[in-house]
UniProtKB/Swiss-Prot annotation:
It comes from the Bacteria. It is found in: Cytoplasm. Belongs to the UbiC family. It comes from Aeromonas salmonicida (strain A449). This is Probable chorismate pyruvate-lyase. Its EC number is 4.1.3.40. One of its GO terms (molecular function) is chorismate lyase activity. It catalyses: chorismate = 4-hydroxybenzoate + pyruvate. One of its GO terms (biological process) is ubiquinone biosynthetic process. GO terms for cellular component: cytosol. Removes the pyruvyl group from chorismate, with concomitant aromatization of the ring, to provide 4-hydroxybenzoate (4HB) for the ubiquinone pathway.
Length: 178
């Protein structure tokens, strides 16, 4: 599915469980965060915003289709950039089955953070945390770089969502990571 994103990426290695990865020490707390990434970014930044890059239909890979419980290989993708004090910090995209759009309120999200909806009042369910490195091409939000990312399955009510978060170079400049 990643070839359909706004920001060109090449995944350098398959998704792996955290125990099988040598993580950069500065990114470890971000990659392994169990709570909301929105909440973490807000905690470490005075300024936080979500830039919606788009919502579109995409072809899901077999493992993506299974993780989001899609009956068809077509799914939906919501792509965003999360901004902090130093600019674009996280490229995020969420995959979900088309049925989830109608029933979960995802259609009305706009630039509201998904994390606020998922981690709202009730404890969120997360599983299938996996990590990988990506080569990201130069784009309007960051220079070309090798970046770490994670994906995990979160649930919005009964609906499984496959949430991807890539940590952009400007995040490593944050003093909280040192």
């Amino acid at each position: 599915m990643k070839s359909e994103l706004t920001v060109p990426l090449i995944q350098l290695a398959p998704w792996r469980v955290p125990a099988d990865c040598e993580l950069p020490e500065a990114l470890r707390p971000w990659l392994l965060e169990a709570d909301s990434m929105t909440r973490r970014l807000r905690h470490h930044n005075r300024h936080f915003s979500v830039q919606l890059l788009g919502n579109r239909s995409v072809t899901l890979c077999a493992d993506e289709q299974q993780l989001v419980a899609a009956e068809q290989p077509m799914g939906l993708c919501r792509e965003v950039i999360l901004h902090g004090d130093r600019g674009p910090a996280v490229l995020g995209w969420t995959l979900f089955a088309e049925a989830a759009l109608q029933e979960s309120g995802l259609r009305e999200l706009g630039e509201q953070p998904l994390g606020e909806r998922i981690f709202g009042d009730e404890p969120a369910r997360r599983d299938h945390l996996q990590l990988a490195c990506f080569e990201i091409a130069s784009n309007p939000w960051c220079p070309a770089a090798t970046v770490w990312g994670r994906r995990s399955r979160l649930f919005l009510g009964q609906w499984p969502l496959l949430v991807h978060e890539l940590f952009l170079p400007s995040l490593s400049c944050n003093k909280e990571l040192e």
